[in-house]
């Protein structure tokens, strides 16, 4: 039970020594009109006092709560005014963020949380409301694996049964020790990031989006019909999973092939559902091994069947990395990249832009754009065995997103979402290449070609008229700058 009067005993802790409310003012960029920002949205949640690997006190909260925030405020108990906090580190794969204060006295009287590994059983969450004298009571029921779509990560997650809906960033307590942080959920069931992942973030990360997260290096499917065993040249009724895709990072990515039938990771046997028998949590997806059984850099043996032959391959536990897609995952804290010439607005295709069509963009966005996101999967598969992906990672899909009406672009003003192929005869692989191509017009004209299937094959702009046209457009649409790279 929590004592709200500042006194802490062996069996109870004062939440105001360890937690505080924060308020954020988030302002996302407008990816449809990339020179603008959207309206400010305020959000509230909880931050916890933690000690980093260097021994410094900071506040821990969720990345979702502080992403794209122009202002972050934390209010200590009895403080007349909130204190401004600054983002020190953020990890969107884990949904964690660290905040620091420029006030030297901010952390005086505060205490860092003590942590412990979670177990099945009763749990509680602190309440920072003077009218609520008791913490929320819940129960950790099991360990499962969740998918963090914003970064395509698979994470071991604790399931918390709780009637109330806690604030974002709330910490789960067992035996007066922190065991994890609430990520999301609905009334009755919540996902909790376990201690092991939180501690890894506190001690290993060194900057923005710096994850040392042990992670799988492949996607898999199960054989739903035993009759497929003959087709795959594996023994009938053999437990295991079929490798359907190899990632360019993570455990097994350097040795596995598409079509391999994986039966063991180390000493753990895989079921047809991808589960292992965990000594503490019972049947759970094999990703749970990356919580504490398998650490980054550790050698592990993979047992599998490949084209009918049984193999044992040794590899090292790999970590999650940004995957170098031509259509990048959701971008935070960075403005959109764009270029405007003659009213033609060029952007690089991103998930942020696709989300202009809403959360269901996979079905609502233009098909030609969605296909490039799907094609990224086969591209990753193709290049996953290459040692140097640096040059490949720089490639992007450049689109003509819209046309700002002006006399110079009459006839083109209804064009939307066309994929740029070439400009002035030069291949366009990112916005920088488009900028360079537009420095070399052909016979006084800029010729921009699009991929087949578009409403137009090409557009033509007269070079001599562009300077005056750009000045008119800049004034008419109040655009601060025509280029952001």
Predicted regions and their residues:
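Boundary at the C-terminal end of the N-terminal hydrophobic targeting segment
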Residues: 6-11
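A short, Trp-centered hydrophobic/proline-enriched beta-strand micro-motif
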Residues: 14-34, 123-127
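Catalytic-center loop of serine/cysteine hydrolases
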Residues: 106, 187-192
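Conserved, short, structured surface segments that act as functional micro-motifs
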Residues: 136-143, 190-204, 437-438
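C-terminal recognition in membrane/secretory proteostasis and scaffolding
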Residues: 2, 27, 36, 45-48, ...
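Soluble extramembrane regions of membrane proteins in the secretory/endomembrane system
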Residues: 149-153
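Hydrophobic or amphipathic alpha-helical targeting/insertion segments
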Residues: 69-71, 85, 121-126, 131-142, ...
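Short glycine/Trp-rich loop-beta-loop segment that forms part of the substrate-binding cleft
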Residues: 113-136, 333-345
């Amino acid at each position: 039970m929590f004592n709200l009067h500042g006194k802490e005993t062996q069996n109870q802790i004062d939440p105001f020594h360890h937690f505080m409310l924060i308020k954020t003012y988030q302002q996302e960029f407008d990816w449809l009109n990339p020179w603008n920002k959207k309206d400010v949205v305020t959000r509230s949640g909880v931050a916890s006092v933690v000690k980093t690997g260097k021994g410094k006190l900071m506040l821990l909260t969720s990345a979702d709560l502080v992403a794209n925030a122009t202002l972050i405020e934390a209010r200590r108990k009895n403080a007349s005014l909130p204190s401004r906090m600054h983002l020190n580190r953020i990890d969107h794969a884990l949904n964690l963020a660290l905040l620091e204060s420029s006030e030297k006295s901010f952390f005086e009287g505060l205490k860092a949380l003590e942590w412990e590994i979670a177990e099945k059983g009763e749990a509680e969450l602190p309440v920072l409301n003077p009218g609520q004298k008791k913490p929320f009571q819940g129960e950790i029921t099991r360990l499962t694996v969740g998918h963090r779509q914003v970064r395509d990560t698979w994470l071991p997650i604790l399931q918390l049964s709780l009637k109330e809906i806690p604030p974002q960033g709330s910490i789960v307590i067992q035996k007066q020790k922190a065991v994890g942080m609430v990520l999301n959920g609905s009334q009755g069931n919540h996902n909790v990031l376990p201690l092991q992942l939180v501690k890894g973030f506190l001690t290993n990360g060194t900057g923005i989006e710096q994850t040392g997260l042990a992670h799988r290096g492949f996607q898999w499917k199960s054989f739903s019909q035993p009759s497929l065993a003959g087709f795959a040249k594996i023994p009938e009724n053999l437990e295991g999973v079929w490798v359907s895709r190899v990632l360019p990072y993570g455990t097994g990515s350097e040795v596995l092939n598409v079509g391999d039938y994986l039966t063991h990771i180390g000493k753990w046997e895989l079921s047809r559902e991808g589960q292992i028998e965990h000594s503490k949590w019972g049947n759970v997806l094999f990703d749970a091994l990356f919580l504490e059984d398998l650490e980054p850099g550790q050698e592990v043996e993979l047992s599998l069947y490949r084209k009918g032959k049984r193999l044992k391959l040794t590899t090292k536990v790999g970590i999650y990395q940004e995957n170098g897609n031509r259509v990048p995952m959701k971008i935070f804290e960075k403005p959109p990249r764009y270029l405007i010439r003659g009213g033609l607005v060029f952007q690089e295709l991103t998930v942020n832009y696709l989300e202009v069509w809403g959360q269901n963009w996979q079905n609502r966005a233009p098909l030609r754009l969605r296909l490039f996101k799907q094609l990224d999967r086969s591209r990753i598969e193709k290049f996953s065995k290459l040692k140097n992906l640096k040059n490949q990672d720089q490639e992007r899909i450049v689109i003509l997103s819209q046309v700002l009406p002006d006399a110079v672009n009459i006839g083109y003003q209804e064009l939307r979402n066309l994929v740029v192929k070439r400009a002035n005869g030069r291949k366009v692989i990112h916005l920088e290449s488009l900028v360079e191509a537009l420095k070399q017009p052909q016979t006084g004209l800029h010729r921009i070609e699009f991929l087949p299937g578009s409403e137009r094959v090409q557009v033509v702009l007269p070079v001599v008229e562009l300077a005056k046209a750009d000045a008119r457009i800049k004034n008419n649409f109040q655009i601060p700058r025509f280029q952001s790279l």
